[in-house]
């Protein structure tokens, strides 16, 4: 959990769509998915909470990159039978 938060804390050092931020984002994504697959569901809850907060502010409709990431997590949660998390993410964008 600390690694996830430490990496997120560095995001202000980079432009959001810079190659450097993409590399950090890819590390975060791989780390989080590995933690979820290992059974650390607090990471799934964090992802749903973080993405849900962003979606509630309209970013899902207005930011194609975020939409891609968001939809990717829905698909990934379904692939690994974490349907309750996919359902929760979908509920944020249906509101």
Which residues does each predicted region cover?
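Short terminal alpha-helical segments
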Residues: 1-32
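Short acidic DE-rich linear segments
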Residues: 91-95
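Acidic, low-complexity, intrinsically disordered interaction modules
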Residues: 22-89
